[in-house]
Amino acid sequence: MRRKRIAAIVTEYRRWSHADVILRNLLDGYPDGGRPGMELVSLYTDQVPKNDMSRDLAKKHGFSICSTIAEALTLGGNKLAVDGVLSIGEHGHYPQNAKGQILYPRRRFFAEICAVFARTGQSVPVFNDKHLAATWEDAHWMYEQARKLMVPMLAGSSIPVTWRKPDLTLPIGCELEGAIQVGYGPLEGYGFHALEGLQCMIERRRLPEKGTEQGVVAVTCHFGKEMWQRFDQFPWAKRLLDAVLPLIRYHAGGDIRQVSPRAEDAAIFEVEYRDGLRAFVVIPNGWLYENEGGSFYFAALRRGAAQPDVCQFYLQQPDPFAHFAELTKAIDHMMQTNHPPYPVERTLLTTGVLDAAMTSRHEKGRRQLTPHLQDIRYKASDWKHAQGPIPAAIRKKSER
């Protein structure tokens, strides 16, 4: 069977960039020895740093380096010449807005991709790495453009498809009293990963309209001296955090509630769902830090359960970054079937929540009403996260 021809539109292509850890699976195959049904035929790089890898890889693997996005999709002709597009707008040097959001050119990438679709009268599946865009306005525009042009679209983080320790999938229709997600890192860049971890779990809860997610009514970012005050008002939240803490192996000394508020980029996102569920995303920077498997943890309390459900979203890193192979498998499924393995609406929602959280922080913790997020509706997918053995990390001597 012919492999699907793929154009990749990336901000930059250097070692360990998202372009590298995703596209390596198309060029060299998966860590388990398998290969996706895709081949990279063209590449557009928005920036070319001194440590760029793409030019040497193009010589080795035979894909074309293109000077425009349109050229990457048409290979210089008048017709669409690819079966799918990977838009990887992550890493590189781009400005920030006043709220601290990095203005990666994800909307511009998608607009130029869609311009080719409109001109040629053809659309193919598009994967958008991470959140759709920094701002809700841009994200919603992209979503509506995809619907208008009937573009099969997948987006988001590798967190929902990575390994879980212990393996945990909440049963469809379970009743939740509350949920928390613990994460680390830059509030926007890694806060998004934490939100994706939260959402991929709690979207399986019992919902009034036959299992259909109904969206979010308000978001608040708590930080500084007030960081833990709201969280500690809910006994179930403390119980869930107490269940997570034994899983965390790598952290600073001292009490999490005393240490984390001192960090400038530590915060807790409070997410209020339309059906009444409340969840917290805890980012205790200064206390929690990255090490083996990353540091993303989920906990939820099911109604009537004796103990909370708890797991770590385990990231295999550094090389071969096998969790990105799992994300590539989800992308490949869409390219082969024209159907995303899980709804892009999940990431539309997490994008909107993240933007609201960043706005709340910019406005000194003001609660943000989110009427625009109340009508994002979708049903949870049965796409399975990573199973089986986790590949061993490969380290150069200098990295050991």
Model-predicted segments: where are they?
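N-terminal Rossmann-like dinucleotide-binding module
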Residues: 1-60, 179
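Beta-strand-loop-alpha-helix segment that lines the small-molecule cofactor/substrate pocket
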Residues: 90-160
